[in-house]
Amino acid sequence: MARVTVEDCLEHVDNRFELTLVAARRARQLASGAAPEVEPGRDKNTVIALREVAAGKVSRAILDEQMPPPLPNFPGAANREATGAEDAAGE
């Protein structure tokens, strides 16, 4: 898939707001070391996440999963743990 469109992704999620949440959560997982479900090529995590949604490999169910703690060498991990900050989804 050369280019991902919102329409491709909306076949697998209910609306564009949910698409934003699903893609953001998946991009965070990829940044934390999760294995991509599609060929990553030279794409950034956000594009890979959208390609996974468009391919039907990632769905709304990802929002129900607990996010693992960030890797120690992940940027901002020390700040997040020190402040007890929650992720953007409010979990």
From Swiss-Prot:
It is an enzyme of class 2 (transferase). It holds the Pfam family RNA_pol_Rpb6. Residues 66-91 are annotated as: Disordered. One of its GO terms (biological process) is DNA-templated transcription. Its EC number is 2.7.7.6. GO terms for molecular function: DNA binding; DNA-directed RNA polymerase activity. InterPro entries: DNA-dir_RNA_pol_omega, Pol_omega/Rpo6/RPB6, RPB6/omega-like_sf. It catalyses: RNA(n) + a ribonucleoside 5'-triphosphate = RNA(n+1) + diphosphate. The keyword RNA-binding does not apply. Keywords: DNA-directed RNA polymerase, Nucleotidyltransferase, Transcription, Transferase. One of its GO terms (cellular component) is DNA-directed RNA polymerase complex. NCBIfam families: rpoZ. Promotes RNA polymerase assembly. Latches the N- and C-terminal regions of the beta' subunit thereby facilitating its interaction with the beta and alpha subunits. The RNAP catalytic core consists of 2 alpha, 1 beta, 1 beta' and 1 omega subunit. When a sigma factor is associated with the core the holoenzyme is formed, which can initiate transcription. Belongs to the RNA polymerase subunit omega family. This is DNA-directed RNA polymerase subunit omega. It comes from Acidithiobacillus ferrooxidans (strain ATCC 23270 / DSM 14882 / CIP 104768 / NCIMB 8455).
